């Protein structure tokens, strides 16, 4: 498996330049939710953004391997239950879907990420 250090670095000055754009992207995504859903979605997105910050990764420059490493981190380092990993990844994927809708990205880096084991669609999707 590829490690984070094998991925090309994202220059830290790039992070500063995109901070306003990232804030706008986060606000646009969270605006789609209200009440408890917004609160819990914000918490899950905050976890992903913190992971990105720990790895000096601009979330708007993330690629598919970064998201797969995020999943592995949740599974192997944090030892989250499969349902938690699935939910938190779904929030990150939704964030990127909104970025594509809003024209901030051409395509979502989450689009072809292998879903974690134990993932299944929500009951209402069946």
Predicted stretch roles:
Residues 6, 15, 35-36:
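Short linear motifs at secondary-structure transitions and domain/linker junctions
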Residues 12-26:
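Short alpha-helical hairpin
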Residues 26-39, 46-124:
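N-terminal core-binding DNA-recognition domain of tyrosine recombinases/integrases
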Residues 1-10, 95:
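N-terminal helical hairpins
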């Amino acid at each position: 498996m590829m490690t984070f250090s094998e991925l090309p670095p994202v220059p830290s000055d790039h992070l500063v330049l995109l901070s306003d754009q990232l804030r706008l992207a986060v606000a646009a995504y969270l605006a789609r939710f209200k009440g408890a859903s917004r609160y819990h979605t914000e918490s899950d997105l905050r976890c992903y953004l913190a992971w990105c910050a720990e790895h000096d990764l601009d979330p708007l420059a993330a690629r598919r391997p970064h998201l797969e490493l995020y999943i592995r981190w949740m599974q192997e380092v944090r030892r989250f239950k499969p349902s938690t990993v699935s939910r938190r990844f779904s929030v990150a994927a939704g964030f990127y879907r909104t970025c594509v809708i809003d024209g901030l990205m051409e395509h979502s880096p989450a689009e072809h990420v292998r879903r974690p084991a134990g993932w299944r669609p929500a009951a209402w999707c069946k």
